[in-house]
Each structure stands twice: as structure tokens, then as C-alpha cells.
Amino acid sequence: MQGQEDGDSILPFAKCSRVVSRFSPCSLPPQNRRPMPQPYGDAFWENLSQRSSSNWMVEQYIPPILRATDCSRPSLHPLEGLPPPEKLWRRKRKKLHLERMQKGPGSIPARVRAVTYHLEDLRRRQGIINELKRAQWGSSDATPELPALEEGFELLSTTKYFDVEEERATYPQKETYSVTPRDQLLWTPWTPVGQQGTYASGQLSSLTYSTATARKNPVYDPQAMELESEE
């Protein structure tokens, strides 16, 4: 008995358990069925019908801002179908940007304004280039002096070149040329006795040209080599 009592104290729920049965709504007893309470009773409808309806034709004042945005009509756009404010603001900003690009400020097309800005930028850059030229070369009218060549050579202007040619034509100078034996073999100068003075300059110029070309482009000639060996 003592062990049984100890067991009962240890496991009280095994002895105190109850059987639970659930009844379907159809099998409920008739006294449990109660009429559903109506939200609007007869008194509500009677008061509604007795209320004066003289102000139904008076239009309710709606601010113009709410009229423009259709905020006064909550049934027009339900809350479930509206996009979030971020998307609405993003679309609005994009639309405004496109309108500005198409129209431009001051009712000027955006392409025309872009072209004018580009031309102004080109004029500004050209002005900077002209200022740098004036700072480097002096005035814009004066032509810049050409730098002198290295090793003491100078560039002759056109007027100086023509002056030198005229002096050579009026005062012919006797030029001496040293002719090597190889040059004599390539070309032997011959002048008649009476026309030595008149053909001297032309023959000497042709002599220098032939010797220069012969030195630049030497041609292998076995007969000339034999003559050089005999000499």
C-alpha cells in the first residue's frame, strides 16, 4: 500500500486524466444556439430615414491641390494598388528630366543649347591658344623668326637668295675643281678654243653633277680598272 501511494504521488496525472469529447455544431443542443447579433438594428434604420436630407445637393468644398491629385476620391485608387512613394518620386523625377532635355530652360530646345555651348567652348579654347601665341611670338601680325640651323648654317630668305643669283649672273667667278683620275676616265671635259669662256660654267656644273653621281652610284667597269692599273 505504501508503494502504491508513493506511485500515486509520483504520477498524479495518470489518475486524474479526463476523457474529452468534441461535438460538431450540428449535434449541439438547441439551447446553445443563439441568434447572431445584427450590427444595425431597427432603431438605426428608423433614425436614418427620419433624418432631414436637405444638404445632399450642397457640394463639399475640396481644395484645388487635392482635386488635381485626386486625393479626394479614395475609391479611385485603392491603397493596395498604389506603388510605394519611392517609385512614384523616381518616375516623376525621370519625367521632369526628360521634359527639361526636350524643352530646355527658356523654351529653347536642348540640342540647340548643346550646340551653342559647344561653340562657346571652342571659341574660348581658340582665344586661349591665340593668347599663348602672342605671349610666345609677340604680336599676331609679326611672323615668327625661324630658328638657325646647327653647325653655323643659316636659312636664306627668298630676297637674299635672288640677290645672290643676280650677283653670280652679273659677275661670273672662275671656279676651280679638283678632278681625280677616276673622274677623268668617267668624263673628259672638252671645250673649243674660241668658246672656252662661254661654256666654262655649264661644263663645270655638269662635271660636278657627273662626279657626284658617279661617287654615289659607282658602276663596275672592267676597262676603267685596266686603264687605272696601266697608269
UniProtKB/Swiss-Prot annotation:
Localization of this protein: Nucleus; Cytoplasm
Knockout mutant characteristics: Mice show increased CDK2 activity in spleen with disruption of the splenic architecture.
GO BP terms: apoptotic signaling pathway; fibroblast proliferation; negative regulation of cell population proliferation; negative regulation of fibroblast proliferation; positive regulation of apoptotic signaling pathway
Reported induction: By serum starvation.
Keyword Nucleus: yes
Main location per the UniProt record: nucleus
Keyword set, alphabetical order: Cell cycle, Cytoplasm, Nucleus, Phosphoprotein, Protein kinase inhibitor
InterPro entries for this protein: INCA1 (IPR026238)
Processing and modification events after translation: Phosphorylated when part of a complex with CCNA1 and CDK2.
One Pfam family hit: INCA1
Phosphothreonine modification, residue list: 180
Gene Ontology CC, one term: nucleus
Renumbered ranges of motif Nuclear localization signal: 90-95
Region (Interaction with CCNA1 and CCNA1/CDK2 complex): 75-99
Family: Belongs to the INCA family.
UniProt function note: Binds to CDK2-bound cyclins and inhibits the kinase activity of CDK2; binding to cyclins is critical for its function as CDK inhibitor. Inhibits cell growth and proliferation and may play a role in cell cycle control. Required for ING5-mediated regulation of S-phase progression, enhancement of Fas-induced apoptosis and inhibition of cell growth.
Oligomer status and interactors: Interacts with CCNA1. Identified in a complex with CCNA1 and CDK2. Interacts with ZNF16; the interaction inhibits INCA1 activity and induces the cell cycle process. Interacts with SPACA9. Interacts with CCNA2, CCNB1 and CCNE1. Interacts with the CCNA1/CDK2 complex. Interacts with ING5, DAZAP2, RNF26, USP15, SPOUT1, DPH7, TRIM26 and RAB5C.
Name under which the protein is recorded: Protein INCA1
Species in which this protein is naturally found: Mus musculus (Mouse)
Gene: Inca1
